Amino acid sequence: MMNTLLQQAPSWGTTLWFIIAAVLLLAVVLGFVTYAIYFERKVIGWMQLRIGPNRVGPLGLLQTVADVAKLLLKEDIRPQHADKALFTLAPILAYAPAFAVLAVMPFTDSIRFADLGIGLLYYIALSGITVLGVITAGWASNNKYSLIGGLRSAAQMISYEVPLVMSVVGIVLLTGSMNLKDIVEAQRDVWNIVPQFIGFAVFIIAAQAELNRTPFDLPEAESELVGGYHVEYSGFRFAMFMLAEYVYMFGMGALITILFFGGWLPIHPSLDFIPGIVWFILKFSVYVFLQFWIRATMPRLRVDQLMSFAWKVLLPVALFNILLTAVVVSYQNGMF
């Protein structure tokens, strides 16, 4: 349907449909963010032999709603010597790209918004813009802790963006396309996690660093930097940074599901009667649970360990995966 609308001449009707689609997508993402935070606190609580949130609403289901309402009602404080324009712009720079990447995600064969031939490249290009919001927030706050957090984020994003991109080159070699729908369709016989297990391992580690999640959460390390790049933010601006983090996690989970877990395809052809969106949600939920598990169990790395691991371990492994995949593809095509 969206492709049909994209091919039509601009009109008030098509504009209205695009607005409705954007609002629906935003509602789904906000619903995910609301209850991802709740389940993260609940799961980590269980792992640490605690109960977790259980006060607001039945089983604590409205705890996140109460927290969001509290943030929105708090005073919006801006440091006296902060750069006003950039201080205001930073949360938008952090959030907008994280939401925009969802436009190319094919959740099923029919539920997708834009079928780009270079959907994978689009995602990689836009996701790199998020770091600009973090760096801008760190510099514009006129705070040493914020600045150090922003600089750490820049170094981390540059270091881990390289192996992240290289880890998906093997998939592009196997499928011959950067269209996310074509990548899913190419996994009908076997999911990419099997022939591209090395690439998957590199991707999921680099993705963890890109999300600034444990054990790579150095840009906002509470024990070292008070709160990192958003230490001077409060109210709805602070909420936008938190929202950007979980929206980005939503996008990364969707991308991993598409690239390595077969997207909406069933685990066996005999289970094809189950709707594709159900399979997508199940696979996506496995990744989200893995995020919670890692946060509950792993310690934070030092800065030198973080950088060394990216350049001395992940990058060589990603290059080896590209070489190995190229040899296999060449052999299959009869070049040897």
From Swiss-Prot:
Belongs to the complex I subunit 1 family. It is an enzyme of class 7 (translocase). HAMAP family: NDH1_NuoH. It is found in: Cell membrane. One of its GO terms (cellular component) is plasma membrane. It is a multi-pass membrane protein. The chain crosses the membrane at residues 17-37, 85-105, 116-136, 154-174, 190-210, 247-267, 274-294, 309-329. Keywords: Cell membrane, Membrane, NAD, Quinone, Translocase, Transmembrane, Transmembrane helix, Ubiquinone. NDH-1 is composed of 14 different subunits. Subunits NuoA, H, J, K, L, M, N constitute the membrane sector of the complex. PROSITE patterns: COMPLEX1_ND1_2. NDH-1 shuttles electrons from NADH, via FMN and iron-sulfur (Fe-S) centers, to quinones in the respiratory chain. The immediate electron acceptor for the enzyme in this species is believed to be ubiquinone. Couples the redox reaction to proton translocation (for every two electrons transferred, four hydrogen ions are translocated across the cytoplasmic membrane), and thus conserves the redox energy in a proton gradient. This subunit may bind ubiquinone. GO terms for molecular function: NADH dehydrogenase activity; oxidoreductase activity, acting on NAD(P)H, quinone or similar compound as acceptor; quinone binding. GO terms for biological process: aerobic respiration. It comes from Brevibacillus brevis (strain 47 / JCM 6285 / NBRC 100599). InterPro entries: NADH_UbQ_OxRdtase_su1/FPO, NADH_UbQ_OxRdtase_su1_CS. This is NADH-quinone oxidoreductase subunit H. Its EC number is 7.1.1.-. It catalyses: a quinone + NADH + 5 H(+)(in) = a quinol + NAD(+) + 4 H(+)(out). It comes from the Bacteria.
